[in-house]
Amino acid sequence: MAKYAAAIDQGTTSTRCMIFDHSGNVICYDQKEHEQIYPRPGWVEHSPDEIWERTQSVIRGALSKGGLSASDIVAVGITNQRETTVVWNRKTGRPVYNAIVWQDTRTDQICNELAADGGQDRFRPKVGLPLATYFSGPKIRWILDNVPGAREAAEAGDVVFGNIDTFLTWWLTGGPNGGVHVTDVTNASRTMLMNLETLDWDDEILGIMGIPRQMLPKIVPSSMVYGTATGELAGVPVAGILGDQQAAMVGQTCFDVGEAKNTYGTGSFMLLNTGTKLVPSKSGLLTTVCYKFGDQPAVYALEGSIAITGALVQWLRDNLGLITSSAEVEALANLVEDNGGIYFVPAFSGLFAPYWRSDARGVIVGLTRYVNKGHLARAVLEATAYQTREVLDAMEQDSGVKLTALKVDGGMVYNNTLMQFQADILGVPVIRPKVAETTSLGAAYAAGLAVGFWSNTDEMRANWGVDHTWTPQMDEATRERLYRGWKKAVTRTFDWVE
């Protein structure tokens, strides 16, 4: 009797296979990094072949570490770095070009040309996203325009597109020998090509971008049996697909309207469940699909993306040498009582949500002779909390929903000083769950739900447990005084790049 659910978590820097029991505990996992390819400034690529090879390797590794075989697994789910774009030959499985990664900015000119008629928000009413290099549509267009023979092959139906979820699902289910060509609604919602209301490809946008519809995968729910795995997981249903931030929402069991989670990594991503209602953003957030389970209606979310949070701690370590490991930032910050009156706004490459200002650059303001490295470390941590507050304010403004608590995950949630200050500056409790691997867990949940391993979302919610809660300890007057200072500091970053 199979008693575990598996997840393949294909991230920006590494690939993992993680196996969970019915209570949502990690039984075993394996992880491997892959190469980051930088052919030119601003260009970032991955080898799709290497990613598929790593995926097979971590599946083998995880099964072996747990002493398990395919017959022990009820279903496998996939979660992935979103927006990263692959175009490959349907007959051979060979990519026509490397995967163009979400951070890659080569499509800047394509985006500017598209924005010349109708502005940056030209497609936002239909797709919920601004025109930006971040999303897949312009990346597909670049490959069709720049790889010899790619456009003709796409029109003939010989080459196909997929994000990483689609590429892995196709290979897992047989590749050139009957592989299933699908993507789920969450990944499709990051292409700029899917209409958020119909949950189908938008022919008008495809026409404007010059992308043949026949190269696109079929859009499917996030939880259903898409096909059966071959190879290491032979016979196991492939039954769940979610983009990484959406998978974290499911892993955190944010199933009710108004529930939110914030993932603290290199940058930070906050998502708020808005239910079956599409909420357009007037405050610089993205409207996206949160999940769709089987034939139930799609659930939507607002997303706030922050470019630099954890990366600022790395900067303190690598560029200034004030600490030798990221974990030391907490002890350094705790040498002082407060920030000594300074604010650090990390607009190293402009500001993301809610400003979207590419002309901004980083500043440290309020310096006096009194300030020391402890104050600097504290200001670095506080910058993460202030940026999160700005996104939260934008979410409350757009949705009309008042947040009562924030669920958190990611690497920085083990920093108590930061998490306490986060609760203080938001004025709501901040909650860290027992199982921190929320992204992988979300993919396993989606797959297990499709085959009845978990019968409903209530069973998943029952698995979710609190590891630690930080409650606000700051009075309202102090909170607002500090936040006013931050808002003033942010204005000092504008209009720097001419």
UniProtKB/Swiss-Prot annotation:
<dbReference type="GO" id="GO:0005829">
    <property type="term" value="C:cytosol"/>
</dbReference>
<feature type="binding site">
    <location>
        <position position="314"/>
    </location>
    <ligand>
        <name>ATP</name>
    </ligand>
</feature>
<feature type="binding site">
    <location>
        <position position="310"/>
    </location>
    <ligand>
        <name>ATP</name>
    </ligand>
</feature>
<dbReference type="InterPro" id="IPR018484">
    <property type="entry name" value="FGGY_N"/>
</dbReference>
<comment type="function">
    <text>Key enzyme in the regulation of glycerol uptake and metabolism. Catalyzes the phosphorylation of glycerol to yield sn-glycerol 3-phosphate.</text>
</comment>
<feature type="binding site">
    <location>
        <position position="245"/>
    </location>
    <ligand>
        <name>glycerol</name>
    </ligand>
</feature>
<dbReference type="InterPro" id="IPR018483">
    <property type="entry name" value="Carb_kinase_FGGY_CS"/>
</dbReference>
<dbReference type="GO" id="GO:0005524">
    <property type="term" value="F:ATP binding"/>
</dbReference>
<dbReference type="Pfam" id="PF00370">
    <property type="entry name" value="FGGY_N"/>
</dbReference>
<dbReference type="GO" id="GO:0006071">
    <property type="term" value="P:glycerol metabolic process"/>
</dbReference>
<feature type="binding site">
    <location>
        <position position="266"/>
    </location>
    <ligand>
        <name>ATP</name>
    </ligand>
</feature>
<feature type="binding site">
    <location>
        <position position="82"/>
    </location>
    <ligand>
        <name>sn-glycerol 3-phosphate</name>
    </ligand>
</feature>
<feature type="binding site">
    <location>
        <position position="83"/>
    </location>
    <ligand>
        <name>sn-glycerol 3-phosphate</name>
    </ligand>
</feature>
<feature type="binding site">
    <location>
        <position position="12"/>
    </location>
    <ligand>
        <name>ADP</name>
    </ligand>
</feature>
<feature type="binding site">
    <location>
        <position position="12"/>
    </location>
    <ligand>
        <name>ATP</name>
    </ligand>
</feature>
<feature type="binding site">
    <location>
        <position position="244"/>
    </location>
    <ligand>
        <name>sn-glycerol 3-phosphate</name>
    </ligand>
</feature>
<feature type="binding site">
    <location>
        <position position="244"/>
    </location>
    <ligand>
        <name>glycerol</name>
    </ligand>
</feature>
<comment type="pathway">
    <text>Polyol metabolism; glycerol degradation via glycerol kinase pathway; sn-glycerol 3-phosphate from glycerol: step 1/1.</text>
</comment>
<protein>
    <recommendedName>
        <fullName>Glycerol kinase</fullName>
        <ecNumber>2.7.1.30</ecNumber>
    </recommendedName>
</protein>
<feature type="binding site">
    <location>
        <position position="411"/>
    </location>
    <ligand>
        <name>ATP</name>
    </ligand>
</feature>
<feature type="binding site">
    <location>
        <position position="16"/>
    </location>
    <ligand>
        <name>ADP</name>
    </ligand>
</feature>
<keyword id="KW-0808">Transferase</keyword>
<feature type="binding site">
    <location>
        <position position="14"/>
    </location>
    <ligand>
        <name>ATP</name>
    </ligand>
</feature>
<dbReference type="Pfam" id="PF02782">
    <property type="entry name" value="FGGY_C"/>
</dbReference>
<dbReference type="InterPro" id="IPR018485">
    <property type="entry name" value="FGGY_C"/>
</dbReference>
<comment type="similarity">
    <text>Belongs to the FGGY kinase family.</text>
</comment>
<dbReference type="InterPro" id="IPR005999">
    <property type="entry name" value="Glycerol_kin"/>
</dbReference>
<dbReference type="GO" id="GO:0019563">
    <property type="term" value="P:glycerol catabolic process"/>
</dbReference>
<keyword id="KW-0418">Kinase</keyword>
<dbReference type="GO" id="GO:0004370">
    <property type="term" value="F:glycerol kinase activity"/>
</dbReference>
<feature type="binding site">
    <location>
        <position position="12"/>
    </location>
    <ligand>
        <name>sn-glycerol 3-phosphate</name>
    </ligand>
</feature>
<feature type="binding site">
    <location>
        <position position="134"/>
    </location>
    <ligand>
        <name>sn-glycerol 3-phosphate</name>
    </ligand>
</feature>
<feature type="binding site">
    <location>
        <position position="13"/>
    </location>
    <ligand>
        <name>ATP</name>
    </ligand>
</feature>
<feature type="binding site">
    <location>
        <position position="83"/>
    </location>
    <ligand>
        <name>glycerol</name>
    </ligand>
</feature>
<feature type="binding site">
    <location>
        <position position="82"/>
    </location>
    <ligand>
        <name>glycerol</name>
    </ligand>
</feature>
<feature type="binding site">
    <location>
        <position position="411"/>
    </location>
    <ligand>
        <name>ADP</name>
    </ligand>
</feature>
<keyword id="KW-0547">Nucleotide-binding</keyword>
<dbReference type="InterPro" id="IPR043129">
    <property type="entry name" value="ATPase_NBD"/>
</dbReference>
<feature type="binding site">
    <location>
        <position position="134"/>
    </location>
    <ligand>
        <name>glycerol</name>
    </ligand>
</feature>
<keyword id="KW-0067">ATP-binding</keyword>
<feature type="binding site">
    <location>
        <position position="310"/>
    </location>
    <ligand>
        <name>ADP</name>
    </ligand>
</feature>
<keyword id="KW-0319">Glycerol metabolism</keyword>
